[in-house]
């Protein structure tokens, strides 16, 4: 009859809404459904750090001039599934013309061994460009070893560092020995050193 028909249709509509809701959900730790993103974020001094287990983990650090809710997103190359990890922030005092900033740290875990990944930073709907990293495959590896780099002007050091990496793009990580800067309490010198390592320390860990 008419009443029975209405009940059946209402039940069918409810099931349809339930299934639609399930289809729109995301796994824990993954980024939310696609929203318009602005690739205008410019984090400062992005770097990768050697982890206790380079086959499955990677630590990402970067700086911003303000305190915000920050995330690092990453995905395996060739895979559209994006994972999101919160980044912990802490105040970093500046000096010598460098303003105070916030340094953020995010640990990426349970990565695939010997796999190519890309990562980016995110605040709200603003993201940085994608940057690359690769996990250790457990086999033989190459490293770039840099000597004492402290100096008053890092122009020459920047050229040396870039050339060494250009000739060893297959390096798994880099090591900087000796004094990295002339005054370890001077944030200005640290920023100068890290600018000279851009394109290196954001691609391989050190």
Q: Language-model segments: which ranges?
A:
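Short, Lys/Arg-enriched N-terminal segments with co-localized hydrophobic residues
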Residues: 1-2
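Generic secretory/membrane-interface signal
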Residues: 10, 126, 173-176
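Acidic, histidine-bearing metal-coordination/catalytic regions of metal-dependent phosphoesterases
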Residues: 20-145
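Active-site neighborhood of divalent metal-dependent phosphoester/pyrophosphate hydrolases
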Residues: 138-206
